[in-house]
Amino acid sequence: MGKRLMSQNRGKGSPTYRATSSRFKADLEHIKTFGDETIEGIITEVVHDPARNCPIIRVKFGNGEERLILAPEGVGVGDKIACGISAEIKPGNTLPLSEIPEGCAICNIESQPGDGGAFARSSGVYAIIVAHEGKKTVVQMPSGEIKRLNPKCRATIGVVAGGGRTEKPFVRAGNKWYKMANKATKWPVVRGVAMNAVDHPFGGGGRQHPGRPKTVSRNTPPGRKVGSIAARRTGVGH
């Protein structure tokens, strides 16, 4: 009898595939403000979060609340930041989109007012305010996509810290392995044709080839359901 495929092992669950969420620091959300309220705080610490590829900062606000938020470039321990409708336009401050001028770089943008932040949260990314059109604010996302958002949605001024992270090469396979292990991702992924026949339907043989049709039915049982599943077309370009 053959061995289980990687997808079957992942479905069963094991320490190899278990999420590392027990080490995550917190959900990063904007502090709640009401009406014209503006809350000021001071950065007390820069924190590493295994859940993210950018640094985060611990902020103690004037109302006594302490919160972890995304760190934009140019802020550090001891700096003051503010969250509210009358906050100054400077890196680290959080305002409604309606109060941010056109052409300004922003990050950690809310999708709906009060959701805490949904867009432009990865290291080194930012979005740009394109225009204010009536009841909508036009924002260009890091991907280049244009979104029209509620002007009451809040965003943080500046670029997310940690830019250039992807420019540093791993150099060694071991470094890549530790990176993927931290994300509960099994790596490297071996091709089916490179396996033994006991490990994969495409394995075995004197040379690397599937040895059978790659198209399989949608109703194929687990363990044999590999390749082009319920493919409408196959061949070059499909």
Swiss-Prot record:
Q: Name one GO cellular component term.
A: cytosolic large ribosomal subunit
Q: Does the keyword Ribonucleoprotein apply?
A: yes
Q: State the superkingdom.
A: Archaea
Q: State the residue spans of region: Disordered.
A: 201-238
Its biological function? One of the primary rRNA binding proteins. Required for association of the 30S and 50S subunits to form the 70S ribosome, for tRNA binding and peptide bond formation. It has been suggested to have peptidyltransferase activity; this is somewhat controversial. Makes several contacts with the 16S rRNA in the 70S ribosome.
Q: Return the NCBIfam families for the record.
A: PRK09612.1 (NF007180)
Xref: HAMAP family: Ribosomal_uL2_A (MF_01320_A)
User: Which proteins does it associate with, and in what oligomeric form?
Assistant: Part of the 50S ribosomal subunit. Forms a bridge to the 30S subunit in the 70S ribosome.
What does the similarity note say? Answer: Belongs to the universal ribosomal protein uL2 family.
Write the protein's name.
Large ribosomal subunit protein uL2
